[in-house]
Amino acid sequence: EEGKFVGKNDDDIVFVERAHVDCLAFAKLVHKNGDMSDVEFNTFRRLYDLLLEQPDVIISLNLSPEVCFERCKARGRKCEAGLSVEYLNGVHNSTNSALLENSNYPDSPKLMTLDVLGMRTEEIVKKIEEMSKM
């Protein structure tokens, strides 16, 4: 569907739930845990660098793994039932590492971080709108 993920005009702001860098973060975590070989990870990394278009800005919503864990428990979703704080810590650390690594490349997108603990959805949206004008 046209316009779902890509803006129709150059000045459109397009929000996606996850940054493309999450793919790298999860691949790094899987590789670190021994579930992806060096050859597989290096192949993934080459394809990642080649195929994924960089966004203009990445806005990272920062929340502690412990709070994420409590929210997952409160939602009661079956698909989240097996999550542990340790796993979420690994995802958190791997994502932050991938974001920082990605921001060191030439022509990398601007990285902005927003601490969202205690913020309501409306406040988060307002802050993102303010950040997008910077």
Name each region found by the language model.
Residues 2-5, 9, 47-50, 102:
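Short, flexible, glycine/charge-rich loop motifs used to bind or transfer phosphoryl groups or to couple energy/partner
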Residues 69-134:
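NTP-dependent small-molecule kinase module
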Residues 13, 44, 58-59, 116, ...:
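Weak global preference for isoleucine
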Residues 9, 53, 109:
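Structured loop/turn residues at beta-strand edges in well-structured enzyme cores
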Residues 1-37, 59:
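A basic- and aromatic-enriched beta-loop-alpha substructure that forms the phosphate/nucleotide-
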Residues 20-23, 64-66, 118-120:
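Short, solvent-exposed loop/turn segments at secondary-structure junctions
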Residues 25-94:
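A glycine- and Lys/Arg-enriched "phosphate-lid" helix/loop adjacent to the NTP-binding pocket
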Residues 17, 58-62, 111-113:
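Short beta-strand segments at enzyme active-site cores
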